[in-house]
């Protein structure tokens, strides 16, 4: 199977969603201006971030903050597939303030771990991704995103 990328952007929120598959070298070190929340669907996704080498397997969630330099490769011949959401900081701040009545002045999250083994978070991430990527009804997308942010 060769490399492929399926990119979409939500017209209402600006959230970008990417589902991709890579074999071998995936991408060189780079960073994003947005928060990334994604889940590995298939294979082993190996990447370096925050000076640590990570190996994400199906069901694991990866969490990157704006400016986190990371790379990517598939250490096994079947490659890896992942789904990820790119959340703009301004949008995320607005949503967290709407969800949590007593949110502090700067309510943007800080991820203690880049790779997470939380089944509930993985399910919420996958559901939010699918509703945004498949452009479900606005109320369905908003509910799924609220559930993800509440994790």
Question: What positions do the PLM features span?
Answer:
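An acidic intrinsically disordered interaction segment
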Residues: 1-9, 112-117
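N-terminal regulatory/effector-sensing and dimerization cores
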Residues: 4-105, 134-137
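Amphipathic alpha-helical segments enriched in hydrophobic/aromatic residues interleaved with Lys/Arg
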Residues: 100-151
């Amino acid at each position: 199977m060769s490399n492929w990328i399926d990119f979409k952007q939500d017209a209402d929120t600006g959230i970008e969603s990417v589902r991709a598959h890579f074999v071998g070298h995936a991408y060189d070190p780079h960073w994003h201006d947005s928060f990334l929340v994604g889940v590995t669907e298939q294979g082993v996704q190996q990447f370096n971030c925050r000076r640590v080498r990570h190996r994400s397997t199906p069901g694991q969630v990866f969490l990157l903050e704006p400016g986190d330099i990371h790379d990517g490769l598939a250490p096994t011949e079947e490659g890896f597939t992942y789904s990820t959401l790119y959340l703009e900081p301004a949008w995320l701040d607005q949503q967290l303030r709407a969800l949590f009545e007593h949110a502090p002045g700067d309510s943007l999250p800080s991820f203690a771990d880049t790779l997470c083994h939380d089944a509930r978070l993985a399910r919420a991430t996958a559901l939010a991704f699918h509703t945004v990527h498949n452009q479900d009804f606005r109320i369905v997308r908003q509910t799924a995103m609220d559930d993800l942010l509440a994790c």
